[in-house]
C-alpha cells in the first residue's frame, strides 16, 4: 500500500526516481512494471502497479463502444496509458504527452493513494490541498452516509 507525499524532481530527460521505500514492493510484487495514465478529473497523472492496472483494464473491457461516455472514458484512460519499468536506479520515464497533460515541470509531488500514486506539479498539488481542506470544512461530514462513522 502506498501512502504519503514525496517531493521529487523531474530530470532533463523526463525521468523521476521512485522513492526508495516503494522500490522493493514494486519490484517484488509487480516486477517493477507500472502503468501511467491521466486522471480524468484532475490535472495529474495516475501511476498503477501493473497488477492493479490489469484490474482496471478488465473493467474497461466491459465498457460499451457504442455508449459515448464509456467510449470517451476508455479512450482517455487507454489512449494515454503507458507501461514503464523501473530502471536499475529506480527511475521511470514519463512520456512527453503525459508530462504535458499534468503540466509537470522540475518539481513534482508523488502522492500515495493506497493502490496507486498520483503525480502532481508541486504548485498544483499545494492548490489541490487547499481545495480539499475547503471542501472538508464546508461539508457536513456526518450527513454523508459513507463518512458518518469515519473518525480519526
Curated annotation (Swiss-Prot):
Q: Short name of one Pfam family for this protein?
A: MraZ
User: What's the domain of life for this entry?
Assistant: Bacteria
Give the main location. Answer: cytoplasm
Can you give the residue ranges of the SpoVT-AbrB domain?
5-52, 81-124
The disulfides recorded in the entry are: none
GO process annotations (BP): negative regulation of DNA-templated transcription initiation
From the Swiss-Prot or TrEMBL record, what is one GO molecular function term? transcription cis-regulatory region binding
Keywords carried by this UniProt record? Cytoplasm, DNA-binding, Repeat, Transcription, Transcription regulation
* Localization: Cytoplasm, Nucleoid
Q: Which GO terms describe its cellular component?
A: cytoplasm; nucleoid
What is known about its subunit structure? Forms oligomers.
HAMAP family under this entry? MraZ
Q: Please report which protein family the annotation says this sequence is part of.
A: Belongs to the MraZ family.
What PANTHER family does UniProt report for this protein, alphabetically? TRANSCRIPTIONAL REGULATOR MRAZ
State what protein this is by name.
Answer: Transcriptional regulator MraZ
Q: Which organism is it from?
A: Shewanella baltica (strain OS195)
The primary gene name is mraZ
